Structure formats: structure tokens, C-alpha cells
Swiss-Prot record:
Domain comment as written in the entry: The N-terminal domain determines nucleotide recognition and specific binding, while the C-terminal domain determines the specific binding to the target protein.
Subcellular location: Cytoplasm
Protein's UniProt name: Molybdenum cofactor guanylyltransferase
Record's keyword terms, sorted: Cytoplasm, GTP-binding, Magnesium, Metal-binding, Molybdenum cofactor biosynthesis, Nucleotide-binding, Transferase
Gene (UniProt): mobA
């Protein structure tokens, strides 16, 4: 199944980054470019369009030339709120979401998720040890359920994904591609990589 003409890539950069001391994680530099740019650059060859979901420093993200989507729900309620805002503000049926702190996304992420979808409205990455529900291919058809879930005060991504009939896709052969950058110490370790 090849959906690359109709999938919009979304870099999720709207979090509070508490473990990063509150710094806007997407704007932290790795190898001379911001973390969000690593993700956008990895997604761009796989998709027709890439947008950014962000809540702070919107002018900096907008300077990239990419469309920037702020959350429609106040107070940084989490990645599901960013996903809902994208559904509300961007046309299309399919969206590939990826957090800004995963700088080594594989070149075949979209094709592998799409090929293993098997009719599900949501599929996400499993690296062989853990789920990565914010690295997910999601159909707009879940928007009503997502709206209701958030209105009920729920925020847990994994529970929502399972409730709407999603499943994980095995990426255990490239587990290292899903190591993310959560703390200043982890960023320092990433800076030492070749």
C-alpha cells in the first residue's frame, strides 16, 4: 500500500519539555541544526507535505516556511491535542506524526507503517521493547473519538490508540532509530555521535 501522495507528515514540537528544563526541545541544536529539522528532513522525502505542531516560538518555526499548527486546546495538554489541532486545521485523510526529539527516523518509516496497516485507522512503531505511540500513521476518521476523549479529560496516547482499533508495527530491526532526546545529558551524548 503506497499512501505517500496523500499523507501529511507532522513534526510534534508542542510539548513543555520538562526533562529538558522547559527549553523548547524542537529548537535545541544537534549537529548544527534544530532537532525538529532532523525529523522534518527525514520525513520530507517520504511524504508530499510536512507541517509542524508547536505551541511556543511560533515565529521561529514559521521562518522555516513550513505550516505551523498551534494547539487549539490551551495549557499544553499533550500530543493528542496537537494531533487534534492538525486534524482541525490541515486537509487530508492520513497523517504521519513524529515527535521532534527522534532525530534518526528511518527512511522507510511511512512505507512500513502503511504496508502493515491492515485496514486499521491507526498504526504506531514498536521497537521490539516498547511502543512509540507518537510515531504513528493516523486516519482523520478518528477525529470524533479523539475530540470526545480529550473533552473527557483523557490524555493517554496508548489507551486512545488501542480504543480506536490501532496496532503496533514491528521495527525491532532498527530499534536505534527510535532513541529520542529527553534530557540535556542525552543531548550531550547525541552530540558526540559521528
Amino acid at each position: 500500500m503506497n499512501l505517500d501522495e496523500v499523507i501529511t507528515g507532522v513534526v510534534l514540537a508542542g510539548g513543555k519539555a520538562r526533562r529538558m528544563g522547559g527549553a523548547d526541545k524542537g529548537l535545541l541544536e544537534l549537529g548544527g541544526k534544530p532537532l525538529w529539522r532532523h525529523v522534518a528532513d527525514a520525513l520530507a522525502p517520504q511524504l508530499a507535505t510536512v507541517v509542524i505542531s508547536a505551541n511556543r516560538h511560533l515565529d521561529i518555526y514559521q521562518a522555516s516556511g513550513l505550516k505551523v499548527i498551534p494547539d487549539s486546546i490551551a495549557d499544553f495538554p499533550g500530543p493528542l491535542a496537537g494531533m487534534l489541532s492538525v486534524f482541525q486545521q490541515v486537509a487530508g485523510d492520513w497523517f504521519l506524526f513524529c515527535p521532534c526529539d527522534n532525530p534518526c527516523i528511518p527512511h522507510n518509516l511511512v512505507d512500513r507503517l502503511a504496508a502493515q496497516r491492515h485496514g486499521a485507522p491507526v498504526v504506531w512503531v514498536h521497537d521490539g521493547e516498547r511502543d512509540h505511540p507518537t510515531i504513528a500513521l493516523i486516519n482523520r476518521a478518528v477525529e470524533p473519538q479523539l475530540t470526545a476523549y480529550l473533552q473527557a479529560g483523557e490524555r493517554r496516547v496508548m489507551i486512545f490508540m488501542r480504543q480506536v482499533g490501532g496496532h503496533a508495527v514491528d521495527f525491532s530491526d532498527c530499534k536505534e532509530a527510535f532513541v529520542n532526546v529527553n534530557t540535556p545529558e542525552e543531548l550531550a551524548q547525541w552530540q558526540k555521535r559521528p
